[in-house]
């Protein structure tokens, strides 16, 4: 894999995914970010096996490929680089070479094949909402999420979808927070799910106010 990418693009991608990486993992591969190229973009993925986040950023790809790189080390290096283009190159032994201006680094990674595969879901419906509305709903309900790990079913936000509206509920057994939002015409989602606390926190962090729909 060989590519050139703007520092701010690489930083944005790493910031989007690195928070899900646990500092106490016993599996070395989970300390790494999965990096792969496709259609002129660099896709970064991190997981703790409960929550997985993927972010795609623009890059000038010279040679396609995939590898995994220690995410905390990569972020700390890129953050200190001067503004401009960053060159990334990975060989068949998963040694990644990074250069920018007069700076040059080498990082040993692990094979992309060792990285846990993304779960596959069968799409049964869809709904579109402005990011700020979804973020507001999560903010209103997440305050009541239970922190009692013995009551796992309460460790998240319950979402109920109908073609007409989305209802979110959270409770810790003492407090209950509920909010609902009418859905636009054409929504096809139906059913209910529980979104775990860590996923809710990541959504609250990643969703933007006044930005595009999700």
Which stretches of residues belong to each language-model region?
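Structural preference for solvent-exposed beta-strand-turn elements
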Residues: 1-211
